Amino acid sequence: WPGLRDRDPNRTPMAWTPARNGGFSTAPDPLLVLPPITAPGYDYRVVNVEVQKQLPGSLLNWHRRMLTCRRLLPALRHGSFRLLHSPHPGVLLYLRCTEAMTVLVAANVTAAGASLSLDLSEWAGERTREVMWGCEFPLAAAEWFVNLPPYGFNWWLIGEVEPGATPA
C-alpha cells in the first residue's frame, strides 16, 4: 500500500463498509493511527466486508466456502493422513480418510502452473466430486490428468458422501 511502511498495511483495520474510514471509526483523519487504504484495487470504499458479502466470487466468500467444506467433511478435520507419490516435484498429494470418506488433496506449492497425471486405480469406478463447488467428475479411472494454477489446490471426494456432508 503506497505510503504505508513496514508492517503498517497489516495493522490497518479491516474495512467493514464503504462509509467513512471503512466503518471502523468515525474519527477525523488526523486522529487515526493509520489512514484507511485508498490505493487503486484496495480502496476501502470498494473492498470491504459489506461489498464482498454480495459478490459470489469474492475472496471473503471463497474463504467462507472453503471453511464450510472443511466443517462438513470430517475427513478434512480429523481423518487419517496418507502422503502419496507426486509425479510433479512442486505438487503435494495426500489423502485424508475416515471409514466413510476419502478426500484427495493436490496442492501446487510453486509460482508456476502444474500439470500432472494421477493414478486413481485404487478407486476405479468410484463416484468422484470436486469438493469446493460440488462438480461431479467422471467415475474414477486408472489415470486422471490434473492442471493446477500457481499456488493452486483442489480437494476431491472419492466414494460415497457421509449423510449431511454434501457441501454443494
Give the location of each predicted region.
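Carbohydrate-interacting/catalytic domains
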Residues: W1-A168
